[in-house]
């Protein structure tokens, strides 16, 4: 028997679900194997724009081996990531906290006090992903702010909470989140390429 391939847990997928489960199990001392059909993507692997379909989309039948997968079903279309990091590669790194109405929705409010149950986990996720307010309001933000004002909701407008490192633009520095044990990060330059893959290393993924 080859103990090199003996694992306590095998996890399929390395996105928000798989990578977190793998981390917590490994922290408890279990031998964990994570299987991911996509590859490791570095900053240089991402396309400059989404018109470069072969480097952006995952469509193996067309020989497109990017990281952005679109699955069409009868009543729903699912966007997902294919690569180490899974969905964290393709989400727009926005991490808003749900409003109170979300936790008290009739469809599930009777099951538990969800705000109490989940608040701590939201905080952990935001800390692990380095969530901060976007320091710059772009055209879309300003439009939303004006709309909120017109609707009498200006006090509810706030900068988007994002998992991005806002250091000096384009300057790479040692990991600022986990005492130097994580990957180097580079300051965001506001290029807007969050969903086509961050080419400078400012977006925090898994």
What are these language model-derived features?
Residues 111-206:
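Conserved redox-cofactor binding core of oxidoreductases
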Residues 1-106, 110-116:
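N-terminal glycine-rich phosphate/pyrophosphate-binding loop and immediately adjacent elements
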């Amino acid at each position: 028997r080859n103990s090199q391939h003996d694992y306590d847990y095998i996890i399929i997928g390395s996105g928000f679900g798989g990578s977190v489960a793998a981390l917590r199990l490994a922290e408890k001392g279990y031998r964990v194997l994570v299987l991911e059909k996509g590859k490791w993507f570095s900053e240089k692997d991402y396309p400059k724009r989404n018109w470069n379909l072969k480097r952006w989309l995952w469509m193996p039948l067309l020989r497109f081996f990017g990281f952005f997968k679109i699955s069409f079903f009868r009543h729903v279309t699912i966007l997902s990531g294919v690569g180490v990091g899974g969905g964290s590669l393709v989400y727009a790194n926005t991490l808003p906290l749900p409003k109170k109405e979300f936790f008290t929705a009739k469809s599930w409010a009777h099951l538990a006090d969800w705000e109490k149950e989940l608040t701590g986990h939201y905080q952990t996720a935001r800390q692990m992903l380095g969530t901060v307010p976007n320091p710059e309001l772009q055209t879309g933000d300003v439009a939303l702010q004006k709309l909120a004002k017109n609707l009498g909701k200006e006090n509810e407008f706030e900068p988007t909470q994002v998992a991005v490192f806002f250091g000096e633009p384009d300057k790479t520095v040692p990991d600022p989140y986990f005492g130097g044990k994580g990957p180097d990060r580079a300051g965001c330059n506001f290029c807007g390429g969050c969903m086509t893959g961050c080419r400078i290393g400012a977006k925090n993924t898994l």
